């Protein structure tokens, strides 16, 4: 069962922030979408079937 490495996650977020500071919004969004997909894939490996997910409070 794979786990999230906090240091690797922080490094990837730093990379996205650097891309945003450089003004390349398209690449930053693309990198966030890749990261999200990878995290969701890991999360789905641990989910119970039929378990309902609640949205985070900051999601619209």
Curated annotation (Swiss-Prot):
InterPro entries (UniProt xref): UPF0509
Entry-linked Pfam families: YciZ
Entry's family note: Belongs to the UPF0509 family.
The protein, known as: UPF0509 protein ESA_01586
């Amino acid at each position: 069962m794979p786990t999230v490495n906090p240091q690797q996650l922080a490094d990837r977020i730093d990379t996205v922030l650097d891309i945003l500071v450089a003004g390349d919004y398209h690449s930053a969004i693309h990198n966030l979408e890749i990261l999200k997909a990878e995290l969701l894939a890991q999360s789905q490996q641990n989910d119970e079937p039929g378990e309902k997910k609640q949205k985070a409070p900051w999601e619209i």
